[in-house]
Amino acid sequence: MIPDEIKERAYQGTTTKEDALTLLEIEPFELFELADQIRAKAVGDNVTYIVNRNINFTDICIGTCGFCAFKDKKGYLLSIDQIKDKIKEAHVSGATEVCIQGGLLPNVKIDLYIDILKAVKSDYPHIHTHCFSPMEVNHAAKASGLSVEETLKTLKANGLNTMPGTAAEILVDKVRNIICPDKLTRQEWIDTVTLAHKLGIQTTATMMYGHVDTWEDRIEHILTIRRIQKDTGGFSEFVPLSFMPYNNPIGEKMMEEGRFMNTGIDDLKIYAIARILLNTHINNIQTSWVKLGKKLAQMALYCGANDMGGTLMEESISSSAGASSGEAISAEELEWIIRATDRKPVQRDTLYRSIR
């Protein structure tokens, strides 16, 4: 049974690390029930989704992340015309957002990112640009001889609306030193998103879990996100991302050592703990039908999640690492999946404003 004082702190938005560790020892469905009650109080029974398009413009990358299956030595780099074609398809499908990210090209300068933004805004100024991770921003800044602040200001001036809060992985340096030693440090990621928020660029917050991380690491990550949000208010959502262990070095090592990927119960516990730790700070917790599958994503709606993500149209990163739930889904199917949980589907925009 969950102690009353832990429940009280959960409803107040002051759950501690110790509380979270205690909750993990509770019978899982009691934990899920508490998270679901907090979700209902925070956001009600609406479940949101977005009609969007994912565009991964290159899989060429100088990075050395051990969890990546997307990077390819042969590689591709979409031309601006190819990107424009994909944006046109997004427009025709009714997308309100394009999410554009790519690998770290050697010596890429900010000009490419500006050209990509202009490719969207020149023809479809109404489409929201949700583009470029904190890692990409830092990479472009360094190659261009600019500060991160100058880079963010330039991107915003050329049409950047919001940023994905990817490249966070686990915000614990001892974990990052194993899984992505050449990536941003914990503090560099924090500094980049904090600066973006203060410049008026909202971001999402993500967490990729289930590799070499512990529950303590995951809790510390979520509490770090909470601290940033208390300072800036710039996160629109929190998105847990379950590690996909196929076709990458970390996954191969896990299999050799007989360590299994996340169980479904672990995935659902993540949503519950995130909802409880982030209560009163971040309202929107997104589940991933791509990574979890449609049925487990439905279950996440009973464990604290309130958003089903996007239609995507294409998805390369998770599918290359073993995700088998598809790369695209229609708005109609998303609504059907949501209604099956006795919740009300609501189409939203990137900033969680209702469209219909």
UniProtKB/Swiss-Prot annotation:
It holds the Pfam family Radical_SAM. [4Fe-4S] cluster binds at residues 61, 65, 68. Binds 1 [4Fe-4S] cluster. The cluster is coordinated with 3 cysteines and an exchangeable S-adenosyl-L-methionine. The keyword rRNA-binding does not apply. Signal peptide: none annotated. It comes from the Archaea. Its EC number is 2.5.1.147. Consists of two subunits, CofG and CofH. Catalyzes the radical-mediated synthesis of 5-amino-5-(4-hydroxybenzyl)-6-(D-ribitylimino)-5,6-dihydrouracil from 5-amino-6-(D-ribitylamino)uracil and L-tyrosine. HAMAP family: FO_synth_sub2 (MF_01612). This is 5-amino-6-(D-ribitylamino)uracil--L-tyrosine 4-hydroxyphenyl transferase. It comes from Methanococcoides burtonii (strain DSM 6242 / NBRC 107633 / OCM 468 / ACE-M).
